[in-house]
Swiss-Prot record:
GO terms for cellular component: cytoplasm. This is Phosphoenolpyruvate-protein phosphotransferase. The lineage of its organism: Bacteria, Bacillati, Actinomycetota, Actinomycetes, Kitasatosporales. The active site is at residues 186, 486. Its cofactor is Mg(2+). Its EC number is 2.7.3.9. It holds the Pfam family PEP-utilisers_N.
Amino acid sequence: METTLRGVGVSHGVAIGEVRHMGTAVLEPPAKQIPAEDAEREQGRARKAVEAVAADLMARGNLAGGEAQAVLEAQAMMAQDPELLADVERRITVGSTAERAVYDAFAAYRALLAGAGEYLAGRVADLDDVRNRIVARLLGVPMPGVPDSDEPYVLIARDLAPADTALLDPTLVLGFVTEEGGPTSHSAILARALGVPAVVALPGAGEIPEGTVVAVDGSTGEIFVNPAEEKKARLAAEAAERKAALAAATGPGATSDGHKVPLLANIGGPADVPAAVEAGAEGVGLFRTEFLFLDDSANAPSEEKQITAYRQVLEAFPEGRVVVRVLDAGADKPLDFLTPGDEPNPALGVRGLRTLLDHPDVLRTQLTALAKAAEGLPVYLEVMAPMVADRADAKAFADACREAGLRAKFGAMVEIPSAALRARSVLQEVEFLSLGTNDLAQYTFAADRQVGAVSRLQDPWQPALLDLVALSAEAAKAEGKSCGVCGEAAADPLLACVLTGLGVTSLSMGAASLPYVRATLAKFTLAQCERAAAAARAADSAEEARTAAQAVLSGE
């Protein structure tokens, strides 16, 4: 009998196949005592296991590249946290085995994270994955993770750790479903980068029996369990039709009446450039630079290293536009040499531009490296600061850019409601705005992007969020400046039309989403997009906003 479940669709496409479940977590090691003379040996075992797991995570990151690399390197740093390792060794000194000491030390750290506010609580899944890998290595048992299979399947898991998502084989994993996570969680972002259909925040998904045939619609968030043959045929036909439409949609982004909407790519480093170029990106709307800093959390990368990496990306887009976000450290991206380790709530503390203004030498080096990397290249370089709260922040960043001799446009990311509410004031100091809708939603609704329980409030269709987008776009238009969106909202083809109708001047997303957005925009006029935007803003919920916009664009 066919049943329908609904979660949150986070990566486009349809997948039909049999269910396979993620490998179970490592069992809790027994709490047996060791003789005092064995303590040194056990400490050595623990250190070797930690080093091996950290090296494995780094290797997976190097293989995956791009955004996945940054996430996995952050996990490797978590495994090697000095305070955590000291706690492991202390527990061994008082009689614990290496595996039990790791298990208990991570449990204590887990409790700290879980109680440190929702932002850091979202890191718990990553921490659990690191713990399981270290304990599995010490016990000599298989690592938890993606099941082995020679046949394609739909993967179901409570949540997917970055180390697993990054190396999913799209030829075998047709799609995946998780019980936890949200539209801007690591799993969702990496799924879009892979082009794998995915649905998250579906409680009870783990109860679907192994081997059951399901159809996953990553656009609507629907899961059809034991779908009828007619349903499978219809979904497959719709998927084939969409694929043909995508192949036919080429060229610059524009509405059907010729209103230009540049479609840009979000990238996490040079490794993401080929996919962006292949997908027809007109440039880069968000170049995350954290990957350069995660290699060594104790020291900033040299100016020379930064110049090399930046130039690789700039050279790939001759006559194109490349928007670079300066280092966004703090909160879920802590760096030993920059971020304080004892902040009670890092998400609301010193992060983003605040961190850089406290360490002007780091900002100066990065801006100087960008200036030198762009020398002699026919590229339109733009540089923006994360976590700009007001005009004073914008002025401090613009002044730093000028002092570094940077010949580029200076911009501000709108991730804090205050920046949207006072966008016209901010624009007195900078030349463009870029809306980071992931964090803007998080701070608007007090809803952590990694916590599945509040994913409803992370939905970029929330009318309050659309109001803030409209405020920013209207301010930019009044000042004769640009206002783009580089958050995951831009990757939703229908929402991309609404954002265009709100006055957004460019859209930036993962490369895999570019064809979907290009094809959808080309179906509608600017006037239709504007009517859809007005209908969405008049709604009272995210679901109503989507339905209202869809009704306008479908002519209902």
